[in-house]
Amino acid sequence: MKGHDDFDGWYKQHQEIMKTDKLSKFFNNFRRVSQHIGVSPYGGGEFSDNKILHYFGSSKDLPDVPKEDIITSCNNYFTSVVELIYDAYLIFGASIDAQQYFTSSNFVTLGKTIEDAEEELGLPRGWTDIGDPDAEEYRWEALRNTTTGCEINHIFEQYLNKIIACSDKLPPYVPKNS
């Protein structure tokens, strides 16, 4: 994404948010301490009400640990990371999601044609052309059908109750002369 229009500003904004977020700071320090120093921040656990809960333990290298149990802390942090990725899909979707990339509107923005899209997919130029100029959206749909889309929508849905919308499926193609 480096060099992408607006990415640096977007990323800087998110870095500032992460720097002020207690869980983000903790997990950044957690990684540093566990990987580079070798300290395990596991503090212990408890069993009550038929539940086992584990907690982080503080140390001189990791003095500030979450009060919540490990599972809750990890889920909350993971959700914030998923939110960041979801935002990236919304802002930069055409650069990271083939379903958003291979659209007429995106290729117009790029100054490219459907034949350029065909070529990018390794197909001969004009491969989807059936001789009907009104069938261009069907051509785009055929190209999108050869690609993957947002393959983490299930994660967005599970953690955020949101999904990245794909192009609506077109009704069956009917030639004008039918």
Q: PLM features: residue spans?
A:
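N-terminal ordered "arm"
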Residues: 1-2
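Acidic, Ser/Thr/Gly/Pro-rich intrinsically disordered interaction regions
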Residues: 5-178
